[in-house]
Every structure is written in C-alpha cells, then in structure tokens.
Amino acid sequence: MSGRGRPRVVGTAGHIDHGKTALVHALTGIRTDRLPEERRRGISIDLGFAPLDLGPDAPPASVVDVPGHEGFVRNMVAGATGIDAVLFTVAADEGFMPQSREHLIVLEALGVRNGVVAVTKADLVSPEWSRLVVETVSEELADSGLASAEIVVVSATLGTGLERLRQALTAVLAALPVRPLDFPFRMPVDRSFQVAGAGTVVTGTVWSGTVSEGETVCVLPAGLEARVRSLEVHGRPVDRAEAGTRAAVALAGPGAGGARRGVTLVGVDRPWSASRRVDARLWLSGSAPRPLESGDRVRVHHGTSEVMARLRWYGDGAVAPGETGEALLLLERPLVPAVGDRLVIRAYSPVTTIGGGSVLARRPPRTRGSRRSDRGRLLERLADTSGQERVTAVLGAAGARGVEEPGLSLDTGIGAAQLAAISLEEDVEAHGGRWFERAVREDAMRRIAESVAHHHETHPLETGQPLSIARKAVRDADSALVEAAIHALIEDGALERRGAGLAVVGRELDLDPEDARLLERLERRYREAGLEAPETDDVAGDLAVDGSHLRGLLRYLEREGRLVKLASDWYADAGAVGRARDLLVARLARDGAADTGACKEALGVSRKYLIPVLEYLDRSGVTRREGNRRILAGGDS
C-alpha cells in the first residue's frame, strides 16, 4: 500500500458523448475505449479502467470509465458499483441531458455522494455560455447527493481546467473514510478473459478485505473453489490486493471456468453465502412513472449482477414515487449481499432506472400474518439504526441461537474492529464464537435455575438435575449460550455441579422416615437376591410402592454405590456384581476366554441373570465379547 493512504476508486458518469472517455485519457494518458466497436463508433459500450495518479499528495486511485448510452446503463451500473467518488461530466455544448439524470439516480441509489462535476468541451462554447451551463448544472444537482460538489470547467482537447480538476479530485479523495480491511474479502467480477500462460483472469474492484497470491477463493453463487495464481493492480504484479483497489486475478481450479461478470469472489473461510431472498429498504425516484406495487417484477442491480426479482412490501401494498418502504425481494438468481449494500432498481419494462435501496437482511426468514408485521417493524428499526443499536437489533431477533462471529459483520455491515469495541459494552457478549444479547443469556440463566429447582421438588431423592435435562430448559438455544449460562450460575453461587448434574447450592437430601424405611428394605431385598435380582415392577408390587417413586429410590441407591444398574430397568446388589466380576476376571485370566456356558458355571446363575451381568461388564470395560466368548478387555483372543 502507498504511504499516501488507502487506494480509492473514481467512476465516471454522464450522458453519452459528454467527454467522459476523453477526460479520462487527458487525466491518465490511457485510452479506456478498448473495444474496436467503441473506437469505430466513438462511444463507450463497456467498462474501461485506468490508474489515476493525481500527484504526490493524493491517495493512489483508479478510474472506472462507464458508458453513457441509454442502451448500456446496465454496464454503467456494474462499473459505478463499488466506487468511492464520481467524476460527473456534463458537456458545455449540450447541458444536462436524459442520461445525465438517469446516471444521477443511479449514483443516488448507490449512495455515492462525493465527487467532482466537470463541465467538458469548454473549447466548443464561449466562456459566457460555460458559465450559464455551470448555473444550470448547479440547479439540476441541488436536491442530489452532489449538491455541494465542486463544478470545474475543462477542455480535454486544450487541457484547460485539468489542473484544477486534479486538485478538486485530490481534495475529495483525501477526505473520504477508508474502507475497512477487517471486513471479509469480497470482489464482484466485472470482466473475465483468457490470457495465454495465465488462464482465466477476472477483474473487479475489491469491495472489502484483502486477497493474496496463492490463496484459495470461492466463486459464488456456484460455490466452486479456485486458487489465486497471480495478482496485478494496473499491470503491476502484487502479492496482495486490498479494499479499494482495482485488481486482476488469475485463477486456477474448478471455479475458474465459471468466473465471469456477475459472480463474486470471496474467501473460503469466511461466512459469505448466496441468497435468493433479501430484505431491503427501497426508495422510488420522484421521476418514476407510477407507484411500485407488491407483486411487481423489477430488475435488481447489485455489485456487477443484474437479476429479476418479485417485490413484496412489508407495509402498504404500494409505494408512490418519492417515497420509501421496507420490502422482501424474491430473486430469480442468487446474490451475495451484506447488510448495507446498495441496490439499483430498474423497471421491468420499459427498462429505466426508477430507484434504489440498501440491504437490511441477507437471509430473511419466511413470515406470514402477524409475524410478517413484526418483521416489517424490525426492518424499520434496522433501517434507522447503525453501530451498536443495529447489532442489538440483529442479536435480539436471533434470540438464543445467536449469530456466528464472522457472520455478524455481514448481518450488520460492521467490521471486526468496531464489533470488538461494541463487545465491551454491557448489552452484548460473545460465547463460543457466537454473539448474543446479554439479556438472552440472563433469561437462559433464569430458565435453567427454575428447571433445576423444579427438579428438586419433583425428584426429592435425586441430588440434582441431569445436565442433559437442564440444558433443554432453554429451547432452540445454541450450546455455547447454555454452557455460558450454566457457568454464570455456578460463578454466582446459585447452582453447583453434583456428579453429572446440577443442584441448587445448599440443597441437601432430606429423606422422610417412610422413604428411609423403604430404602432399608430395598437394600436388604437386593442384597439377599444377589445376582438373581427381582424385576423392578415385581418389587413395586411386593412393597406396594408407586413405580415412579420406586425408581427414584433405586436411582438413589445407585448413586450411593449400593446398587448397580444392569439394564434399563434392572438393578442388582453392588456387592454381588463386584464378586461376580472378580470371579470372572480370575477365570478369564486363567483360561484366556470363556463361552456363555463356562461363564454360567463360574457365576452359578441361570442365563436369565447371567446375560445382563456379562453385558454390564462389557460396557464397563472389564470384558469384551467375541462371538459367544468373553475375554478380558485389552486381552488377545
């Protein structure tokens, strides 16, 4: 990167034959009308590119020269997307023209509010006429984002005004905020061609992040990967291209074949995804011929892509010219958006630019009825907020699921550095690589604490609630949030771990006299039975005890180490099982292996009682079954 600052991209705009290409040539020395047809017809058809050196005090820059002909507005939009500032041209001999106005609408839609206006071809008119044109241009721009832009009268042929134009551009570019490098890499492709020895080469403006030689990128929406063989910035080989640069990327691999204008290069380890559904705040130009209604088909320009979409307003069924609204765009082909991305909206037929907007959500949920109304209100809130308020709104909508850390940048339009600063605030926090509202974690704590307390009341013989059950107290929650809530409850002294469960701190078992007597009878019953333990339902009938209550007593004796659970509903005396284990281990140590008959002989029980004991010893890692034989676990057969 140059010591003069981060790279910038300037785009031209203006009516056909208003001197855009000639002015770029005068500023850069490069002819951007590269196509034979462009030079034959004397007009720009596709995009042209050149380095823009404005002097030692200016940041490094590139210029994108766009066509002015009404038939090539889609190419103009593809070039204007991603620019930092505009060089808007109006010919002195013609003044403001229809494509001047349409290009101005496109710039408004893209949020381009910085630039310089050049009144070109001053050599063709008198100075008095040039002054009149400047006044007219100023009036035309009065209600636009370029209202305060400096207007410079120039002649590319004579060179007059060019130095002042360079100074004006330098001032504009120097005052612009830098594009963050901590936002995930993304580069919409505007050209693709084959180069001998290099293979597929694509060009574009790096919208965000960085890309390096040798790195693997993903070509979206196809999802195929490609390796960056080499990088160039204006014909110079570089190791890395960063946000704000015009880059040529040589690709190799499966994704290279599908890399063409309209696709997007992203980093493979980043959370970018293609989507056919986008929520957006849209505005309709005051010059639009009619209201835009729900169900209308429109052309959506995003990056270098143009896709057809069906529009659904969240509020009223139509938006009148000059008004705004929140809408769902159902795209016929996927885009690769981030929140805050700009959109240009053009009519289906006749094809004219009618408005624009910005992305509010890149993967909106499907909603109906009241939930759709709630969604509309959330989008209004998102559209009118930024920074921490937007983060809070997004996390509030995500609830206990949270948002993955890299994806939060794309869902809010905020880079990693600003997110890190926001994480220091009190109302948001990160756990396990995901972000949550603090209130969501506090609600999870409350639900888990209530669940554990309720378990104590309904299972008085258990020392605590199993963790697997406690975790289910927070429905549809990310596991990282649940673990953070449990950790906080333990740190606060509200809960404690007991074995594989959670218990309220200070809560002890308080056996009533009847349960104490039942436990004594149960322990004696199982001790006397040895391995020939009774089935649980039989015990419940013999002792006239409710089955659920009996199972609670049995689990208590198991936790105390007095019983062993052999099967799902079968317990045996722990001492008897221990003696059986010792007998079988001694037999296997002597003989190496024993079939079922030998095991039955060693333990002196029928097959009914033998098999549960053998399976328990297998699960416990004492023995291992091989066919019909048992061997010691870890031993050789």
Label the model's feature ranges:
Residues 12, 125-130, 136-139, 254-565, ...:
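C-terminal effector modules of nucleic-acid-centric enzymes and ribosome-associated factors
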Residues 91-92, 116-132, 152-160, 165, ...:
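G-domain G4 guanine-recognition motif of GTPases
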Residues 69-70, 92-97, 112, 121-126, ...:
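Conserved nucleotide-binding/hydrolysis micro-motifs of P-loop NTPases
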Residues 17, 23, 42, 65, ...:
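Residue-level signature of catalytic and energy-coupling elements of molecular machines
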Residues 59-60, 66-71, 80-132, 539:
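Conserved Switch II/interswitch segment of TRAFAC-class P-loop GTPases
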Residues 1-66:
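Conserved G1/Walker A P-loop phosphate-binding module
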Residues 2, 122, 139-288:
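Conserved catalytic-core segments of large NTP-driven translation/proteostasis enzymes
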